[in-house]
């Protein structure tokens, strides 16, 4: 039987500002990526998010970012190896404090936004993130884009790696994600997106935006639940995976 993790970004509210439908999405995913304060989230939000994850039996991961609250972590920054490593360690430590207080463990590490996209193509940046994770806890799974520089960096640092794919995003011919700024970057046809997900899991292939068949591995599918329509889409994905006899379970069960 095929196994796959369903992950979603959570805990991205901040102060008086609410973002996402965290309580609802937790019913359908097996792992969540928790914002650690640099692009979103704050101490009270982190506390609430971990409480919700624990109540629903969902595994947690750190979701660190460039220090960019105003830009929601989606703007690139030129930072050194040491800065990248220390930013990651700082945010891991923040999440660990809450996790330890609740007798929970950090299952995985997944970079956010621009940090994720840059680490997918910049091995030096990816190595900095992997070094941070390895020095913090070598048992934490590094979750990153399938067939990217992050995969190679994780191997070099001796970390377990989980290949992530996206249900609603288009791919370039080289396996990177099409920029959100470009037309066609987001796939709005739910049935098409679900067919693509099943193909990625069962055949380890996806068709790029230019029609090229590319190889990738799907250990975890990133889904979003930040509005009612997105939440309904997640329900459909889960239902269709179960129909295809694909088992949904957290990364720690098979990576």
From Swiss-Prot:
GO molecular function of the protein, one example?
A: 5-oxoprolinase (ATP-hydrolyzing) activity
Any single biological process term in GO: carbohydrate metabolic process
Q: What is its EC number?
A: 3.5.2.9
**Keywords noted in UniProt:** ATP-binding, Hydrolase, Nucleotide-binding
Q: Which InterPro entries match?
A: Glyco_hydro/deAcase_b/a-brl, LamB/YcsF/PxpA-like
Q: Which HAMAP family match?
A: PxpA
Q: What is this protein called?
A: 5-oxoprolinase subunit A
What is the scientific name of the source organism?
Campylobacter jejuni subsp. doylei (strain ATCC BAA-1458 / RM4099 / 269.97)
